[in-house]
């Protein structure tokens, strides 16, 4: 039977504004989302039998129906209605529950891979409509462009071209629940949203919009997030911020050498996860 292996990239948020709480319990957001080439690896193989299995072997990531990638594959197999199944194995290189979108990226990659293997011929827009039912960030990874995301994250517009950047990602390993962060976020009436630059020709242009409303919740509870931001800036990052609901912090650098040097100094003896990646 047919098979393929795909890469599922992580993301960082250059901007995360929380606009309002919605009646359905979600929040309206304004985000600028950027993919980076720290990737999970996903192998998908179709089978003649109808069983579906997803294997990851990573602590904190369920196998089977509890995995968002399983749900994505199930949705596509149900659409195909051909009696086939699939085996999916995931090598997790993206930290789990880290603000980097790893689970959403895995689901999006499975949707795109199954679309290809099953020869369903769905457009990206059709895949995105399936993806948003799985998770608010899933459509972004199908969109495959640096995006301004609004609504709960499903309304996507391509951003102007941005310079390629090197990104240092550091995760201190503290557990931050996304639900807890949003529950404890104090929404104040805000004025008009800051206008985004029309052009992004330099690293400084990107750094000028770095902002994350969720830091107001996470940093008081986990001061190490602020410590990492300060350390990154001290070691040459042109900007540093928490990604998503954390706890991963990213720093932006002009070149790989600067990012690698900062990584070596920052995490020596800490036991923290750290990786240098490039924007996609």
Curated annotation (Swiss-Prot):
Tell me which species this is from: Pelobacter propionicus (strain DSM 2379 / NBRC 103807 / OttBd1)
Q: Which chemical reaction does it catalyze?
A: 4-CDP-2-C-methyl-D-erythritol + ATP = 4-CDP-2-C-methyl-D-erythritol 2-phosphate + ADP + H(+)
Keyword presence, Nucleotide-binding: yes
Say which domain of life the source belongs to.
Bacteria
This protein is called 4-diphosphocytidyl-2-C-methyl-D-erythritol kinase
- Which terms are listed as keywords in the entry? ATP-binding, Isoprene biosynthesis, Kinase, Nucleotide-binding, Transferase
Family annotation (Pfam families) = GHMP_kinases_C, GHMP_kinases_N
Q: Does the keyword Zinc-finger apply?
A: no
Q: Record's InterPro entries?
A: GHMP_kinase_C_dom, GHMP_kinase_C_sf, GHMP_kinase_N_dom, IspE, Ribosomal_Su5_D2-typ_SF, Ribsml_uS5_D2-typ_fold_subgr
Q: List its EC numbers.
A: 2.7.1.148
Which of the seven top EC classes does this enzyme belong to? transferase
Q: Which residues bind ATP?
A: 95-105
Q: Which GO terms describe its molecular function?
A: 4-(cytidine 5'-diphospho)-2-C-methyl-D-erythritol kinase activity; ATP binding
Instruction: Briefly state the protein's biological role.
Output: Catalyzes the phosphorylation of the position 2 hydroxy group of 4-diphosphocytidyl-2C-methyl-D-erythritol.
User: Which is a GO BP term held by this UniProt record?
Assistant: terpenoid biosynthetic process
**UniProt-listed HAMAP family:** IspE (MF_00061)
